[in-house]
Amino acid sequence: MARRCEICGKGPLVGNTVSHANNKNKTRSLPNLRSVRANLAGEIRHIRVCTRCLKAGKVVKAGRGRPTASAQA
């Protein structure tokens, strides 16, 4: 499973940690991904979305189960 947002395509970043002795070690910064049940074109799927896309409202979350009587009124 790829560590990539399915909406914006954000993925891991690669950089260096540099010690005081100027030694360089590779490090990866992973995106903050969440698994979400989303409604995509009328189809409910599990997708991996970054929290930035969730906050921006780019994803319509799918509800769980049938609506209750109070929600229909």
UniProtKB/Swiss-Prot annotation:
The keyword Ribonucleoprotein belongs to this UniProt entry's keyword annotation: yes
Keywords from the UniProt entry: Ribonucleoprotein, Ribosomal protein
Alphabetical list of InterPro entries matching this protein: Bacterial_rp_bL28 (IPR050096), Ribosomal_bL28 (IPR026569), Ribosomal_bL28/bL31-like_sf (IPR034704), Ribosomal_bL28_bact-type (IPR001383), Ribosomal_bL28_sf (IPR037147)
A single BP term in Gene Ontology: translation
Signal peptide location: none
HAMAP family, sorted: Ribosomal_bL28
Protein name: Large ribosomal subunit protein bL28
Natural source organism: Anaeromyxobacter sp. (strain K)
